[in-house]
């Protein structure tokens, strides 16, 4: 992070907090609501009902997350400007934060599903697998962030394509987009591992 522009970590944190709202409202709500039924099904050794409860909650998380992803991608600059656009928060900061939000929401569905599957593990009394996969994915995020920062700093054509895609071509400090990109990829990989081990 020391190689990034001043204020990059703040922008990353703002974007992370914005994308955490739908994860908290949708993913956490459905996973917490499903937990008692998962515990009941597992204690009665009714695996068909257990998988059914996971399936119902997963469909609801996906159903509600997809429109929110669309809204966040399309209206990201407006949302960031309304919520954060006061005081010293410049238009360039708004654009970088909005681009970060767009990268974060790539993994919005998988973040919600991870919360659900972790509750499924907890319902069975298995806390080791989700702990190890979450630690592994956290390490992966750190490694990917360092790798992407290096790549973006040494390959201007790659960062240029990302800047064009996210419409931040003329904004300085776009290397910080390596952080939300690494987080999104790490979240997707975390979901894949938790799903495979489930």
Predicted feature locations:
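Membrane-embedded alpha-helical bundles of multi-pass transporters/translocases
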Residues: 1-198
């Amino acid at each position: 992070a020391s190689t990034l522009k001043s204020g990059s970590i703040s922008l990353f944190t703002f974007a992370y907090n914005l994308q955490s709202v739908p994860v908290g409202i949708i993913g956490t709500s459905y996973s917490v609501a499903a937990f008692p039924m998962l515990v009941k099904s597992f204690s009665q050794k009714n695996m068909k009902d257990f998988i059914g409860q996971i399936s119902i909650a997963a469909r609801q998380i996906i159903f509600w997350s997809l429109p929110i992803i669309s809204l966040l991608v399309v209206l990201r600059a407006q949302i960031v400007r309304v919520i954060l656009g006061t005081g010293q928060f410049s238009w360039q900061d708004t654009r970088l934060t909005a681009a970060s939000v767009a990268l974060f929401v790539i993994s919005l569905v998988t973040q919600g599903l991870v919360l659900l599957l972790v509750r499924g593990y907890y319902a069975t009394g298995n806390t080791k697998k989700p702990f190890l996969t979450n630690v592994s994915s956290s390490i992966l995020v750190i490694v990917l962030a360092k790798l992407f920062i290096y790549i973006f700093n040494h390959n201007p054509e790659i960062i240029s394509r990302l800047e064009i895609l996210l419409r931040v071509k003329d904004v300085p400090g776009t290397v910080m987009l390596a952080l939300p990109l690494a987080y999104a990829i790490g979240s997707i990989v975390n979901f894949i591992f938790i799903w495979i081990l489930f």
